[in-house]
Amino acid sequence: MEVDFYIPDDELAIQVSYSIEGSDTTEKREVEALQKLPKTLSCKRRVIITYDEEKTIEDEYGMIEVIPCWKWLIQQ
């Protein structure tokens, strides 16, 4: 399992990809890494930061947020 960033104090996992749409392999790789994480680490929030895509992906552990970079930056 590999994620781009994990912030233990916030229990936040982040994947970064320019785009996850249009490529089944890219989306699968980015999402699967975040889906496996809660099995080994405590994780309250899972995020994929993209250039301009936005959606939510639900799984057995809750939601994975897909958000554009600009939106993630103004939230911080």
Q: For the regions a protein language model found, what residue spans apply to each?
A:
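A cross-kingdom feature that marks ATP-driven nucleic-acid transaction machinery
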Residues: 1-76
